[in-house]
Curated annotation (Swiss-Prot):
Source domain of life: Eukaryota
Binding site for a beta-D-galactoside: W248, G249, E250, E251, E252, R253, N254
Pfam families with a match to the protein in the record: Gal-bind_lectin
Record text on subunit structure and interactions: Homodimer. Interacts with CALCOCO2/NDP52. Interacts with PDPN; the interaction is glycosylation-dependent; may participate in connection of the lymphatic endothelium to the surrounding extracellular matrix.
Protein name: Galectin-8
One Gene Ontology term of the molecular function aspect: integrin binding
UniProt comment concerning the protein's domains: Contains two homologous but distinct carbohydrate-binding domains.
InterPro entries: ConA-like_dom_sf, Galectin-like, Galectin_CRD
């Protein structure tokens, strides 16, 4: 489960510039969480994931994350190898604001870093140097840092699929050892039917050119869809609905921030409350959906399809 609690090796109020050793290897699933504040007069700051701390010659930088506030605000990402910079990857969707606090979550994935700021996905950066070689984090520039924390994890290390708390229905999807993803469409029976306090977790990765995908909670006997979650990346809409008595109801689309982006890893948590479903993406609450299908105990099936790699499903 993606949680920003229980971080390890937390460093509080470090003096900037800060250069510190990362005590364990960064493997897929590891998180680095940096909380701080941008001063009024800041023009730029950077977080560098380095191979050592040498100054002469300068240590290689596997991932250089550099928000800039001068002229057009942007985030510049790059890699430094043998004192030479590679090509810049620039993101103009700027989540940082002067005189505002921030929380940056760097997640290490198998092929890339995934970065979220204040709970919102910001960018992906493909590995040019293996993250397992990174042993140092450096923070430089005009920035105040309140804390740096780590969660060393190998949850995603094997990327082997699982379906805990569910019994898969469509035989072609039955798990094979070492399989890298669950095939779609995926349908599975919950080992215990839905009700207040029940939770379903779906872990996956959005395809590069994804248009949409859907996650449905279904009453198996009637095939009514109690909860239809349908992120549409092509229009940035997170559509919710129910399919009851052979008819779709009224769509709900209102959302503060669309939480998905092509190529990103996600953990979707669906929690069943007495009056509604609550949905969180990557540990951040996203929406509520009032129950339209009242017989919660009849909801016994999970269905997933669309433009994603489905890695893991769990229910308890």
């Amino acid at each position: 489960m993606l949680s920003l609690n229980n971080l390890q090796n937390i460093i509080y109020n470090p003096i900037i510039p800060y250069v510190g050793t990362i005590t364990e290897q960064l493997k897929p699933g590891s998180l680095i969480v940096i909380r701080g504040h941008v001063p009024k007069d800041s023009e730029r700051f950077q977080v560098d994931f380095q191979l050592g701390n040498s100054l002469k010659p300068r240590a290689d930088v596997a991932f250089h994350f550099n928000p800039r506030f001068k002229r057009s605000s942007c985030i510049v990402c790059n890699t430094l190898t043998q004192e030479k910079w590679g090509w810049e990857e620039i993101t103009y969707d700027m989540p940082f604001r002067k005189e505002k606090s921030f929380e940056i979550v760097f997640m290490v994935l198998k092929n890339k870093f995934q970065v979220a700021v204040n709970g919102r996905h910001v960018l992906l950066y493909a590995h040019r140097i293996s993250p397992e070689q990174i042993d140092t984090v450096g923070i430089y520039g005009k920035v105040n840092i309140h804390s740096i924390g780590f969660r060393f994890s190998s949850d995603l290390q094997s990327m082997e699929t699982s379906a805990l708390g569910l019994t898969q229905i469509n035989r072609e999807n039955i798990q094979k050892p070492g399989k890298l993803q669950l095939s779609l469409p995926f349908e599975a029976r919950l080992n215990a039917s839905m009700g207040p306090g029940r939770t379903v977790v779906i872990k996956g990765e959005v395809n590069t050119n994804a248009r949409s995908f859907n996650v449905d909670l279904v009453a198996g006997k009637t095939r009514d869809i109690a909860l239809h979650l349908n992120p549409r990346l092509n229009v940035k809409a997170f559509v919710r609905n129910s399919f009851l008595q052979d008819a779709w109801g009224e769509e709900e689309r209102n959302i503060t921030c669309f939480p998905f982006s092509s190529g990103m890893y996600f953990e979707m948590i669906i929690y069943c409350d007495v009056r509604e479903f609550k949905v969180a993406i990557n540990g951040v609450h996203s929406l509520e959906y009032k129950h339209r299908f009242k017989d919660l105990s009849s909801i016994d099936t999970l269905s997933v399809d669309g433009d994603i790699r489905l890695l893991d499903v769990r229910s308890w």
